[in-house]
Amino acid sequence: MILLTGATGTVGKALLPMLVEGGEEIRALVRDPRRLGRHRVAVRITLGDLGEMGDARTRRQALRGVQTVIHLAAAIRDQPVAKVEELNGLATARLLRAAEETGVERFIFFSAIGATEFERTRFFRAKALAEAAVEGSDIATTVFAPSIVYDRNDPWVTLTRRLSLLPALPLVGRADAAYEPIWAQDVARCVIAELDGAKPGKRRYELAGPERLTYEEMSRVIAWSIDRRRQTVHVPANLIRLGLNGVRRVVGDAAFATWEEAELLEVPMVSERGTADAEALGVKPKRMADVLAA
C-alpha cells in the first residue's frame, strides 16, 4: 500500500489518477475527502493534515499496512495550528520517524530546487531541513527537487490569468528570478517511473522543464494562453509586502495571497542538470506555452 500526502495539491491531482489506474492500493491523508473528486471512492482515507503529524494516533492510522510513503504535502503559509517551519520541516521528520518505526520500506519526498538552510525564505529553509532528515534515514529514500510546478488550472496560473484581465499585469518587484517550470503531469510521470523502475535505494532527482524563464516571462506566457497581451507593471516588493500583510490582518486565512507566497517568486529555481534527470526516468518535459495552449 502507498500512503499519499498532498493528494489534492497540484502534483497530487496529477499523480493520484496514475496510481489508481496502475492498480496501486492507495491511502490518502487529506483534510477534506470531497476534494479528491471521483477518486474518493478508489482510495482509503485518513483524515488529517501536516498540522496533525504531531498526533501519534494520526500517524499510526495513516501508516497502517503501508510499504511506500509519497510525501507531497507542503505549506507555503502559516496556518492557525502551526508555522511554515513546523508544517514542512517538523511534520516531515515526524512522518519519516513513524515510517521507520512501522516498517515502511520506501519514503519518497518532494523538496525544491534551491532549498538550502541559508535561503532567505522560511519555506525553503524548512524544506532543506526536511530533505536532510530524509537523506539521513536508514530506509530507502528518493528525493524529488522540482523547479516551479504548474498545471493548466492551478491556483497560481488561475490568479495570473485573472490579473491579466487588468489594463496592465502587476508583478512583484523586478520579476527577474529565473525558473525552469515543469508541468505537473510530467512530474507525476517521473514519480511513476521511479516506482516502477530500479530497486529502492538512495536517489535524488532535480526536475526541471525545458526552458529557463524569468517570473515576468512566465507571467506573459500565462497571459498569452488566454490571448491577453498586456504590458507589465513592476510593483515594489515593499509595497506588495505591506499590502498583503494588511489584507491578511483583515481577512485572516481567507487572504487570496500572503507575502510568504509572493516572496517565493523572487527566489531562483534552476538546475544545472536541466531536463537530464527527468529524461533519465523516461520523461521529456513539455514547454509551458505548449501545455497551456492545449
Task: Give a label for each model feature.
Residues 194-259, 268-294:
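Mid/C-terminal beta-alpha module of Rossmann-like enzyme folds, strongest
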Residues 101-106, 139:
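A short helix->loop->beta-strand "cap" motif at the edges of active sites that frequently abuts
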Residues 85-89, 108, 127:
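Short alpha-helix in the Rossmann-fold core of NAD(P)-dependent oxidoreductases
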